[in-house]
Amino acid sequence: MADLPASLLILNGKSADNEQLREAIMLLRDEGIKIHVRVTWEKGDAARFVDEARQLGVATVIAGGGDGTINEVATALIQCEGNVIPALGILPLGTANDFATSVGIPVALDKALKLAIAGNAIEIDIAQVNKETCFINMATGGFGTRITTETPEKLKAALGGVSYIIHGLMRMDTLQPDRCEIRGENFHWQGDALVIGIGNGRQAGGGQQLCPNALINDGLLQLRIFTGDEILPALVSTLKPDEENPNIIDGASAWFDIQAPHDITFNLDGEPLSGQNFHIEILPAALRCRLPPDCPLLR
C-alpha cells in the first residue's frame, strides 16, 4: 500500500483522544502511507483544512466524525474550484453515523481507514438548500427534527441512536404536526406532517429508514411524509408495511419546494435550519466519494 497517494484526515475534536484510531494511523504510516491529521474545534475549521489539503496535493480528504463532520467536509469539497479536487473518505466516529452505515462503511476503524484511502472513488450527488446550505444524507423536519436536536448529549453518548427513540417517547405529549405545502416534479401535497424526510441517503436519527429507496447517484431526492393527528398512532403505524400504511406519502424529484405559514425546522445532517420557505435541489455527481464495491446506495 506504500504507493498510495497521501491523504488528509479531518478529525472531529471529540474523537481526538481515540487511542484505537491513533494505532490504526500509526500502522498505516509504518507501511509507508502518508496521512496528515488535522483536528476541528469550531465551525469553519473543516473548510480551512480542505484548502490546506489541496495545497498539499492529497488525493483524499477523510472526514472523521459523525454525519455533521461528513457534511462539513463534503460541503467544503463541492465549493472547491479547479480540475484536481480530492475525493471524500469517511471514517465513522459519531453517535449515529447514519450515512456511513447506510453506504456500507466498515465499523472497524482500521478497515474504514483503508477504504477511505484506497477505495474506489465514485461520483455521488449532494443536496443543496436555498442555494447555500448542503446535506449529503438527509433533511428531516417535524417530530424527528425536534427529537434529534433536543436529545441530551449525555444520553446520545450512553445509548447512541437508541437515545433518539427514548427521548422521542418522553416528549410525545408536547409535539404537534407541522402544517406545510410541498411541491416537486409531478408532486404536490399539503397538510399536517408529523415527520418529513427528504433523502439523498436512506436513514436518519440513529438508523430510522425514512427514505428506503434513496440512491446517492441517481440525480433524485426521495421524499417521505408521515401524516396523522397524533404522534403515538403514527409511530405505531410505521411498523406496518408501507403499502398498508395510510399515514405514509412518498415522492421522488430532483427538487422540492416547501412552504409553511410558520417557522419549521429542518435538520440537515445534524445541523438545524429554520424558516418558512425551503428550496431543496439535488446536485448530481457533485463530488467523488470512496465507497465499498457493494455499496447498496448505488444504482
Swiss-Prot record:
Protein's cellular compartments: Cytoplasm
GO terms, biological process: phospholipid biosynthetic process
Aminoacyl-tRNA synthetase among keywords: no
Sorted UniProt keywords: ATP-binding, Cytoplasm, Kinase, Lipid biosynthesis, Lipid metabolism, Magnesium, Metal-binding, Nucleotide-binding, Phospholipid biosynthesis, Phospholipid metabolism, Transferase
GO molecular function (one): ATP binding
Cofactor: Mg(2+); Ca(2+)
PROSITE patterns xref list: DAGK (PS50146)
Listed InterPro entries: ATP-NAD_kinase_N, Diacylglycerol/lipid_kinase, Diacylglycerol_kinase_cat_dom, Lip_kinase_YegS, Lipid_Phosphate_FormReg, NAD/diacylglycerol_kinase_sf, YegS/DAGK_C
Pfam families, per database record: DAGK_cat (PF00781), YegS_C (PF19279)
Assigned EC number: 2.7.1.-
GO cellular component terms, A-Z: cytoplasm; plasma membrane
Residues the entry annotates as binding ATP: T40, G66, D67, G68, T69, I70, N71, E72, T95
Primary role: Probably phosphorylates lipids; the in vivo substrate is unknown.
UniProt name for this protein: Probable lipid kinase YegS
Source organism of the structure: Escherichia fergusonii (strain ATCC 35469 / DSM 13698 / CCUG 18766 / IAM 14443 / JCM 21226 / LMG 7866 / NBRC 102419 / NCTC 12128 / CDC 0568-73)
Name of encoding gene: yegS
